[in-house]
Amino acid sequence: MNTQNNSTHIEIPENWGMYMQRIDGKPSVTRVNLALYDSAPYSGYQYRIQLAVYYKNQTESGLPTAEENPQLWEIEDAFVELLKQVDAIDAGLMKWNNRLNFFFYVKKPEGMEAKFIDNLKQQFPDYEYKLWVDEDKAWECYFETLYPDKYGMQEIKNNQVLNALLKHNDNLEKERQIDHYLFFKDEETAHFFLETVEKEGFKETAHRTDEGEELPVMTCISRVDIADDIHDITWHLLDIAESFGGDYDGWESPIATD
């Protein structure tokens, strides 16, 4: 992380990811601009704005109903258009605790409530809105609340593969061989890892060593699984790999259709 100097009009990198997390025991669907991580906090953008839009209907978990989601997507689109009209950096959003929360950073918070709430009320008068302003020079909300931990980051990567499969009409509930790639510092730790996962039905299908790399030993392990279960599977392998000083690098799957 480093501090970056910016003019009024700055070009912001974008790489959006979505994942589930729990905050205060409640589930949150979190969408975050991952690309901000390396340059944040942005110099001068020290005020964090949180804009809440309260659902009209929600599930017991505090998430919106499937029926209300399309209306919330329209509100999201309207918010993005309003954000283009001010000097602000969009950090992300959370659907959590019966409300949709937008988070963005500005240099000057004056006039933001009128800009966003008044305009959104005109377009979507049936909703209740609230806006908070907090000084957050270090962008703690971005780093500690919006940005994913290692499990959330793996979920984002998983979703990218799952979405690619769905584009080819994959049936995610159908069993298929799934290949996982992992890296270790030496043959010994790779061997101990393999001994552990083989007890869970995995088998090694490829192995190579690339001298000069920090983790030179690559192993590919495979097992027949359901793609819909991939989050739990990858989180488990990630933990085991890290316990041996290794790195879980990802997975691939053939397309499985009915």
What are these regions (language model features)?
Residues 1-258:
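Long, contiguous binding/interaction regions
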